[in-house]
Each structure stands twice: as structure tokens, then as C-alpha cells.
Amino acid sequence: MANNAQGKQDMGTGSVKKLMVKMAVPALVGQVVNLLYNIVDRIYIGHIPEIGGAALTGVGLFTPILMLITAFAMLAGAGGAPRAAIAMGQGDKDKAEKIMGNCFTVLLILAALLTTVFYFTCPTLLRLFGASDVTLPYAVTYGRIYVLGCLSVLIVMGMNTFITTQGFASISMLTTVIGAVINIILDPILIFVLDMGVAGAALATVLSQVVSAVWILLFLTGKKTILKLKVPNMKIQGPIILPCLALGISSFVMVSTESILSISFTSSLARFGGDVAVGAMTVLTSINQLITMPLSGICQGGQPLISFNYGARKYDRVKEAFFCQFGVCVAYTTAFWAVLMVLPNVFAGIFTSDAALVDYTAWALRIFLACGFSVGFQISCQQAFMALGQAKISLIMALLRKVFLLIPMIFILPLFFQNKAFAVFLAEPVSDLIAAAVTTFMFFRFFIRMMKEGKALQQS
């Protein structure tokens, strides 16, 4: 209790910059580890002799299915964990354990369904996404092996949140770190030493997820956990599971739109630019994550500080915390964007040794990320909306870029340009700039009004 009280006192009186660093660094480390998990396969695959470019393109085409699997995991995990936390806060541990058990059962059912559906429909879906005769074999090989490990993927993504919600943030982070380290070690062994190629990359990912899943289950059934995973609690009960799924719908929709966005890009680029354009998009997506994922870590550090002081009506500290978050996000994206614009070939070369793909990606990068500096404005303001309790406007601003701007522009802009592939890539910076301008304007209008009202309330 003393430590908890001290923590609250620090949030309200301690140095804002020091607190920001203290809270952002662990989140940033977690995001970087997640980033490695996401891109390490692609880096190794892109450097497989002779087939690297085609193999990388094939694996990139599987991304929409991977995102859909993630979305279903979020449906149970992102919806169930907060419900369990609320039950714990109410002192109802039994209900919290029933929530966790029910969510686990839902994940098992989803794993069986998704494995069956995606294993058999994989070739057809990948064709629809833009796979060619050259890239389809690599996409199917990677996809089917990954799908066979769907159970462990869902457990990791869906159940790790129940560890975090109990306050075991370090254990939760270790889940990701363990999987990432094993994946990084196994990738070169299976891909190059055992000469398994794309199949080796998929197997490395699945095995690392299996180890992470076992780690989670051992913890949730062990002595240290507060909430225990018990068989009797796994019986589905409507009043228990339905509120969890209802809460998880928002996260499900957000991740699902990423899948739709990925399909829109790959199918359009396959039509207008062929395999090399789709391969470039795979690399660009990974490079874009180098921009966006660290921003999430920075904002995760800033959110509790902004929220606490907003609740405590310490508006000067809210202002200081926001501008600290805003400044770091904008500085990072601007600096990284400048380096990308100067050295596009270097970054493209990290992911593949295919000369033609490197050259095309370097050309596409300067178009696709032309307004990459603006992402810092949009994400920092959107996340600040969330920190100030404005969840609805935050969701609208997040959907603005993807659903209302980017996806339509992918199909509209090629109507006005002779170089259709150029137009598809151009959809990204146009959407980024508009979304950043609108989000920043909306936030500062709200923020200035909030500060004035807050100061008036303090003086009255």
C-alpha cells in the first residue's frame, strides 16, 4: 500500500520528464521486441540465395491472414482481460477466473475453426490477394505451416493479456522476449543450416510461439498467478463470455481493418506492378513499423501520466506531459523520415539481396513514406485523446486514416495517373498528411478548450 501511495504521489508531483522516461522505456522495449518478432523472418527470407525476392513477396502476401488470426485473438483477449480486471477490482475473484476460463475456451474453438478454414482455403485466398505462379508456392508453404500453429498463436496473443491485467507486466513482457529470442535463433538454423528455406522460417515462428504458449499456461496454472486457469471455469456461460466479446469487438475491428488494408494494397499492386511491386510493399510495411511501433511505446509511457494528472485536475502537468510526448514523437518521426529519404537503398537492402527488388523498393519508399514525418503528429494526438478519456473521437481519428482515406484512395488515385503503381503508393502519404492535419487540429481545439475550462474551474 505504501509503494502504491508513493507511486501516486510521484505521478502527481514528480518530474514529468523523468516519469515519462521511467514509464516509456519498458513499453518501448516491449514494442521493439515485438517489432523484431514481426520483421526478423522477412529479413532472413529476403536473403535466401536466388529465391529471396520471390520468397519475401510470397510471405508478405500471407499478412492479411496473419492479421485476421490476430484480430480473433484480440476479440477474446482484449475484451476479456479488462472484464477480469473489473471483477478483481470488485473483489470477485471467482468471476474473474470464470471470465479467463471462458475466454480460453473461445480461443480453443477459434483455433480449431481458423486452422481448418485457412489451411484449406489458403491457396485460393492468396491468389485473391495477388499471388502469382512464382510467389504462390512460397506463400502457401509459409501460410499452411503457420496456420497449423494457430492454437499457440491465439493462446499467446489472447491469454498474455490476462497476465498483464493481474499486474505481472514483467512476466507478460518475458512472454514476448522468450518467443522473439527463440525465433531469432531458430530462423538462420532452419532456413540456412538445415536448408529448409521458407518452411524453416514458418517453423521457427510456430516453435517460438509454442514455447511462449507453454510459458503462459505454466504461469496461469502455477503458484504465482492471482487468477488460476481451471478446467471447471472453461464451460462457456453466456452471461460471462458475451460482455467480453462485446468489449473486444472494437479491437477486433481495428485489427481487421489492417487486414483489409493489406489486401487492398497487395491486390492493387499485383495488378499494376506485378511481383516486384508486391515485394516492395512487404518491405515498406516492415520499414513503416520501424516508425509506428516505437511511437506506441512512447505513448504508452505518456498515457498514464496524462490520465492521472487530468483526473487530479493538475492541468499544467497534463500540458507538460502531453507536449513532452508530442515533442518526442514528432522529433523521432521527423529524424527517422529524413534518414529514410536520404538512404532508401540501405533500408531496402536490409530486407533483401535481390538487386531488382532493392532498386524498386528504394524508388517506392520515397513515395510511400513521403509524409512519414506527419505520423508523429497523428499518433501522439490520437493517443492523447484516449488518455483524456475521449475514446470515441480517438477511434474515429484512427479509422479516419485507414478506412475513410487510405483504402478508398488506393482504388481512386490510379484512375488519375498513368503510372498506376505510383498512384497506389501515393495513397499512403496523401492519407497520412490529411489524417495528421485533421487529428492535430481536432486535438488542439479540444485541448485548448479543456485547459481554459480546467483553469476556470480551479479559480472558482
Feature map (PLM): residue ranges:
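Short alpha-helical transmembrane segments in multi-pass integral membrane proteins
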Residues: M1-P26, A84-L151, V193-G248, I306-C371, ...
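N-terminal transmembrane alpha-helices
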Residues: M11-I51, P64-G79, R83, L108-T115, ...
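Transmembrane helical elements of multi-pass membrane transporters/channels
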Residues: K22-D41, I145, G179, S208-S212, ...
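Hydrophobic/aromatic residues in alpha-helical transmembrane segments
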Residues: V25, D41, G80, T121-C122, ...
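Helix-terminus/linker motif at the lipid-water interface of multi-pass membrane proteins
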Residues: V32, L36-L56, L126-D133, I189-M196, ...
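Interfacial/gating helices of multi-pass transporter permease domains
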Residues: I45-M67, V134-Y138, V198-A199, I240-L247, ...
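Small-residue-rich hydrophobic transmembrane alpha-helices
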Residues: L56-T116, V153-S172, T266, A280-P344, ...
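Short runs within selected transmembrane alpha-helices of multi-pass transporters and secretion channels
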Residues: Y146-T164, S172-A180, A201-V214, S296-C299, ...
